[in-house]
Amino acid sequence: MRGPGAVQIGPACGARSVSPWETAAVTEGSGRKWLTVRGALRVPEITVYFWVIKALSTAMGESTSDYLVHAIDPVIAVALGFAGVCGALALQFAMRRYVAWTYWLAVAGVGVFGTMAADVLHVRFGVAYAASTVLYAVVLIAVFVTWARTEGTLSIHTVDTPRREAFYWAVVVATFAMGTALGDLAATTFHLGYFGSGVLFAGVIAIPAFGYWRLHWNAIFSFWFAYVATRPLGASFADWMGKSRTVGGLGWGDGRVALALALAIFCLVAFLALTRRDLQQPDRSPRLP
Protein backbone atom coordinates (compact mmCIF):
# COMPACT_ATOMS: atom_id res chain seq x y z
CA MET A 1 0.00 0.00 0.00
CA ARG A 2 1.34 3.41 -0.89
CA GLY A 3 1.65 5.98 1.85
CA PRO A 4 0.39 9.56 1.39
CA GLY A 5 3.83 10.81 0.41
CA ALA A 6 5.09 7.79 -1.51
CA VAL A 7 6.12 7.58 -5.12
CA GLN A 8 6.12 4.47 -7.25
CA ILE A 9 9.35 3.27 -8.83
CA GLY A 10 9.45 0.63 -11.51
CA PRO A 11 6.71 -0.96 -13.58
CA ALA A 12 3.27 -1.56 -12.15
CA CYS A 13 4.00 -5.24 -11.60
CA GLY A 14 6.19 -5.66 -8.54
CA ALA A 15 6.39 -1.91 -7.90
CA ARG A 16 7.32 -0.66 -4.50
CA SER A 17 6.64 2.58 -2.67
CA VAL A 18 9.28 5.07 -1.61
CA SER A 19 8.65 7.50 1.24
CA PRO A 20 9.59 11.19 0.88
CA TRP A 21 12.60 10.59 3.14
CA GLU A 22 13.91 7.72 1.02
CA THR A 23 16.54 8.42 -1.57
CA ALA A 24 15.17 8.87 -5.07
CA ALA A 25 17.52 6.24 -6.46
CA VAL A 26 17.10 2.49 -6.44
CA THR A 27 20.00 0.19 -7.03
CA GLU A 28 19.74 -2.50 -9.67
CA GLY A 29 23.00 -4.38 -10.10
CA SER A 30 25.70 -1.78 -10.61
CA GLY A 31 23.42 0.95 -12.01
CA ARG A 32 20.88 3.41 -10.63
CA LYS A 33 17.58 4.90 -11.69
CA TRP A 34 17.02 8.56 -10.94
CA LEU A 35 13.73 10.42 -10.98
CA THR A 36 15.19 13.36 -12.88
CA VAL A 37 15.49 14.67 -16.41
CA ARG A 38 18.91 14.83 -18.05
CA GLY A 39 20.36 18.33 -17.88
CA ALA A 40 17.25 19.86 -16.32
CA LEU A 41 18.24 19.80 -12.65
CA ARG A 42 18.29 23.23 -11.04
CA VAL A 43 20.53 22.48 -8.05
CA PRO A 44 24.22 21.51 -7.86
CA GLU A 45 25.84 18.18 -7.15
CA ILE A 46 26.39 17.75 -3.42
CA THR A 47 30.16 17.77 -2.99
CA VAL A 48 32.61 19.25 -0.51
CA TYR A 49 32.48 22.45 -2.59
CA PHE A 50 28.75 22.70 -1.95
CA TRP A 51 29.15 22.48 1.81
CA VAL A 52 32.06 24.92 1.94
CA ILE A 53 30.23 27.56 -0.11
CA LYS A 54 27.02 26.94 1.83
CA ALA A 55 28.79 27.54 5.15
CA LEU A 56 30.52 30.65 3.79
CA SER A 57 27.23 32.01 2.43
CA THR A 58 25.50 31.62 5.78
CA ALA A 59 28.30 33.51 7.49
CA MET A 60 28.35 36.16 4.77
CA GLY A 61 24.59 36.65 5.03
CA GLU A 62 24.84 37.22 8.77
CA SER A 63 27.70 39.73 8.51
CA THR A 64 26.22 41.59 5.54
CA SER A 65 22.83 41.92 7.19
CA ASP A 66 24.29 43.19 10.46
CA TYR A 67 26.52 45.65 8.62
CA LEU A 68 23.72 47.07 6.46
CA VAL A 69 21.21 47.62 9.26
CA HIS A 70 23.80 49.63 11.19
CA ALA A 71 25.42 51.44 8.26
CA ILE A 72 22.15 52.74 6.78
CA ASP A 73 18.56 53.17 7.91
CA PRO A 74 17.25 49.72 8.96
CA VAL A 75 14.05 50.13 6.95
CA ILE A 76 16.04 50.92 3.82
CA ALA A 77 18.39 48.01 4.55
CA VAL A 78 15.51 45.54 4.83
CA ALA A 79 13.92 46.95 1.67
CA LEU A 80 17.20 46.52 -0.18
CA GLY A 81 17.55 42.99 1.18
CA PHE A 82 14.05 42.11 0.03
CA ALA A 83 14.60 43.61 -3.42
CA GLY A 84 17.92 41.80 -3.70
CA VAL A 85 16.54 38.36 -2.84
CA CYS A 86 13.54 38.84 -5.14
CA GLY A 87 15.80 39.82 -8.02
CA ALA A 88 18.21 36.95 -7.39
CA LEU A 89 15.41 34.38 -7.18
CA ALA A 90 13.75 35.77 -10.31
CA LEU A 91 17.03 35.35 -12.17
CA GLN A 92 17.45 31.83 -10.79
CA PHE A 93 13.93 30.79 -11.84
CA ALA A 94 14.57 32.17 -15.32
CA MET A 95 17.34 29.63 -15.83
CA ARG A 96 16.38 26.41 -17.61
CA ARG A 97 18.92 24.39 -15.62
CA TYR A 98 21.54 24.76 -12.91
CA VAL A 99 23.95 27.66 -13.38
CA ALA A 100 26.53 28.20 -10.64
CA TRP A 101 26.47 32.01 -10.67
CA THR A 102 22.71 32.42 -10.47
CA TYR A 103 22.22 29.61 -7.94
CA TRP A 104 24.76 30.92 -5.45
CA LEU A 105 23.65 34.51 -6.00
CA ALA A 106 20.18 33.39 -4.92
CA VAL A 107 21.63 31.60 -1.88
CA ALA A 108 23.54 34.75 -0.94
CA GLY A 109 20.41 36.87 -1.31
CA VAL A 110 18.41 34.49 0.84
CA GLY A 111 21.22 34.51 3.40
CA VAL A 112 21.10 38.27 3.79
CA PHE A 113 17.33 38.66 3.81
CA GLY A 114 16.77 35.54 5.94
CA THR A 115 18.94 37.10 8.63
CA MET A 116 17.00 40.34 8.43
CA ALA A 117 13.65 38.53 8.66
CA ALA A 118 14.71 36.74 11.82
CA ASP A 119 16.21 39.85 13.40
CA VAL A 120 13.15 41.99 12.65
CA LEU A 121 10.93 39.76 14.77
CA HIS A 122 13.27 40.12 17.75
CA VAL A 123 14.45 43.72 17.43
CA ARG A 124 11.33 45.37 16.01
CA PHE A 125 8.56 43.31 17.62
CA GLY A 126 10.31 41.98 20.71
CA VAL A 127 9.72 38.31 19.93
CA ALA A 128 12.02 36.11 22.00
CA TYR A 129 14.57 34.02 20.12
CA ALA A 130 13.04 30.84 21.50
CA ALA A 131 9.61 31.81 20.16
CA SER A 132 10.92 32.87 16.74
CA THR A 133 12.95 29.66 16.48
CA VAL A 134 9.82 27.60 17.12
CA LEU A 135 7.81 29.74 14.69
CA TYR A 136 10.29 29.29 11.85
CA ALA A 137 10.64 25.59 12.67
CA VAL A 138 6.88 25.19 12.27
CA VAL A 139 7.05 27.03 8.94
CA LEU A 140 9.90 24.79 7.81
CA ILE A 141 8.04 21.61 8.76
CA ALA A 142 4.92 22.88 6.99
CA VAL A 143 6.90 23.45 3.79
CA PHE A 144 8.48 20.00 4.03
CA VAL A 145 5.10 18.33 4.54
CA THR A 146 3.49 20.24 1.68
CA TRP A 147 6.42 19.47 -0.61
CA ALA A 148 6.34 15.77 0.27
CA ARG A 149 2.59 15.45 -0.21
CA THR A 150 2.66 17.36 -3.48
CA GLU A 151 5.74 15.84 -5.13
CA GLY A 152 6.10 12.55 -3.26
CA THR A 153 9.78 13.09 -2.40
CA LEU A 154 12.08 15.59 -0.75
CA SER A 155 15.09 14.59 -2.80
CA ILE A 156 17.04 17.44 -4.36
CA HIS A 157 17.75 15.09 -7.26
CA THR A 158 14.17 15.68 -8.41
CA VAL A 159 14.29 19.50 -8.45
CA ASP A 160 13.75 19.77 -12.19
CA THR A 161 10.50 21.77 -12.49
CA PRO A 162 9.54 25.31 -11.41
CA ARG A 163 7.12 23.99 -8.77
CA ARG A 164 9.71 21.70 -7.21
CA GLU A 165 12.23 24.51 -7.29
CA ALA A 166 9.72 26.78 -5.54
CA PHE A 167 9.44 24.24 -2.72
CA TYR A 168 13.22 23.96 -2.59
CA TRP A 169 13.74 27.70 -2.20
CA ALA A 170 10.92 27.99 0.32
CA VAL A 171 12.80 25.46 2.45
CA VAL A 172 16.05 27.38 1.98
CA VAL A 173 14.43 30.65 3.12
CA ALA A 174 12.90 28.95 6.16
CA THR A 175 16.19 27.30 7.14
CA PHE A 176 18.06 30.59 6.95
CA ALA A 177 15.49 32.37 9.13
CA MET A 178 15.23 29.54 11.66
CA GLY A 179 19.00 29.04 11.76
CA THR A 180 19.57 32.72 12.48
CA ALA A 181 17.15 32.67 15.40
CA LEU A 182 18.59 29.38 16.66
CA GLY A 183 22.14 30.70 16.57
CA ASP A 184 21.15 33.85 18.48
CA LEU A 185 19.22 31.70 20.95
CA ALA A 186 22.31 29.63 21.73
CA ALA A 187 24.69 32.60 21.84
CA THR A 188 22.59 35.01 23.92
CA THR A 189 19.70 33.28 25.66
CA PHE A 190 21.76 30.21 26.57
CA HIS A 191 24.84 32.40 27.18
CA LEU A 192 27.18 30.25 25.12
CA GLY A 193 28.69 33.22 23.34
CA TYR A 194 29.41 33.38 19.63
CA PHE A 195 32.40 31.05 19.63
CA GLY A 196 30.76 28.57 21.99
CA SER A 197 27.65 28.58 19.84
CA GLY A 198 29.77 27.91 16.76
CA VAL A 199 31.47 24.96 18.43
CA LEU A 200 28.07 23.60 19.48
CA PHE A 201 26.70 23.65 15.95
CA ALA A 202 29.93 22.23 14.55
CA GLY A 203 29.16 19.24 16.75
CA VAL A 204 25.54 19.21 15.62
CA ILE A 205 26.45 19.16 11.93
CA ALA A 206 28.80 16.24 12.58
CA ILE A 207 25.82 14.12 13.67
CA PRO A 208 24.22 13.65 10.22
CA ALA A 209 27.66 13.30 8.64
CA PHE A 210 28.53 10.44 10.99
CA GLY A 211 25.06 8.96 10.71
CA TYR A 212 25.16 8.91 6.93
CA TRP A 213 28.68 7.58 6.46
CA ARG A 214 28.86 5.16 9.39
CA LEU A 215 25.32 4.28 10.37
CA HIS A 216 23.79 4.34 6.87
CA TRP A 217 21.18 6.94 7.71
CA ASN A 218 18.74 7.95 5.02
CA ALA A 219 20.46 10.24 2.50
CA ILE A 220 17.64 12.78 2.20
CA PHE A 221 17.14 13.09 5.97
CA SER A 222 20.90 13.44 6.52
CA PHE A 223 21.19 16.10 3.84
CA TRP A 224 18.44 18.33 5.20
CA PHE A 225 19.62 17.81 8.79
CA ALA A 226 23.07 19.07 7.81
CA TYR A 227 21.63 21.83 5.62
CA VAL A 228 19.64 23.29 8.51
CA ALA A 229 22.64 23.09 10.85
CA THR A 230 24.96 25.01 8.53
CA ARG A 231 23.02 28.23 9.09
CA PRO A 232 23.58 28.68 12.85
CA LEU A 233 27.11 27.30 12.40
CA GLY A 234 28.10 29.94 9.86
CA ALA A 235 26.20 32.75 11.56
CA SER A 236 27.79 32.05 14.95
CA PHE A 237 31.34 32.15 13.63
CA ALA A 238 30.55 35.24 11.53
CA ASP A 239 29.34 37.05 14.65
CA TRP A 240 32.40 35.84 16.56
CA MET A 241 34.71 37.33 13.93
CA GLY A 242 32.77 40.52 13.33
CA LYS A 243 31.41 41.63 16.69
CA SER A 244 33.39 43.71 19.16
CA ARG A 245 35.50 42.22 21.93
CA THR A 246 33.13 43.64 24.53
CA VAL A 247 30.46 41.15 23.47
CA GLY A 248 32.78 38.20 22.95
CA GLY A 249 33.86 38.77 19.35
CA LEU A 250 37.23 39.31 17.70
CA GLY A 251 36.37 42.86 16.69
CA TRP A 252 37.21 42.56 13.00
CA GLY A 253 34.02 44.37 11.99
CA ASP A 254 30.95 43.05 10.19
CA GLY A 255 31.78 44.92 7.00
CA ARG A 256 35.29 43.51 6.70
CA VAL A 257 34.13 39.99 7.50
CA ALA A 258 31.30 40.23 4.95
CA LEU A 259 33.69 41.47 2.26
CA ALA A 260 36.24 38.72 2.93
CA LEU A 261 33.57 36.02 2.87
CA ALA A 262 32.02 37.41 -0.32
CA LEU A 263 35.44 37.33 -2.00
CA ALA A 264 35.99 33.71 -0.93
CA ILE A 265 32.55 32.74 -2.26
CA PHE A 266 33.22 34.54 -5.54
CA CYS A 267 36.49 32.66 -6.07
CA LEU A 268 34.94 29.27 -5.31
CA VAL A 269 31.90 29.86 -7.53
CA ALA A 270 34.18 31.06 -10.34
CA PHE A 271 36.17 27.84 -9.98
CA LEU A 272 33.02 25.74 -10.19
CA ALA A 273 31.66 27.71 -13.14
CA LEU A 274 34.90 27.10 -15.04
CA THR A 275 35.45 23.46 -14.09
CA ARG A 276 31.76 22.46 -13.94
CA ARG A 277 32.61 20.09 -11.11
CA ASP A 278 29.30 20.78 -9.41
CA LEU A 279 27.07 19.59 -12.24
CA GLN A 280 24.94 16.50 -11.71
CA GLN A 281 26.68 13.53 -13.31
CA PRO A 282 25.16 12.06 -16.51
CA ASP A 283 24.77 8.62 -14.93
CA ARG A 284 22.24 10.15 -12.59
CA SER A 285 19.85 10.74 -15.44
CA PRO A 286 16.76 8.55 -15.59
CA ARG A 287 16.64 5.11 -17.05
CA LEU A 288 13.02 4.53 -16.21
CA PRO A 289 11.08 1.63 -17.71
Language model regions located:
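Polytopic alpha-helical membrane proteins, predominantly small-molecule transporters/carriers
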Residues: 21-289
